[in-house]
Structures are given as C-alpha cells and as structure tokens.
Amino acid sequence: GWINEEKIQKKIDEP
C-alpha cells in the first residue's frame, strides 16, 4: 500500500 496504489487501481479500472 503506497500512495500511488489508489491511482494505479483507478487507471486499471477505467482506461
């Protein structure tokens, strides 16, 4: 769990 983890997960969810 780092800070960018949330942003990366969102990028994977919606292109």
From Swiss-Prot:
Signal peptide: none
GO terms assigned for molecular function: toxin activity
GO biological process: defense response to bacterium
Keyword match rRNA-binding: no
Highest taxon listed in the record's lineage: Eukaryota
Keywords (A to Z) from UniProt: Antibiotic, Antimicrobial, Disulfide bond, Secreted, Toxin
Post-translational modification as stated in the protein's UniProt record: Contains 3 disulfide bonds.
Cellular component terms (Gene Ontology): extracellular region
Main location: secreted
Similarity-based family: Belongs to the long chain scorpion toxin family. Class 3 subfamily.
Protein name (database record): Scorpine-like
Species annotation: Opisthacanthus cayaporum (South American scorpion)
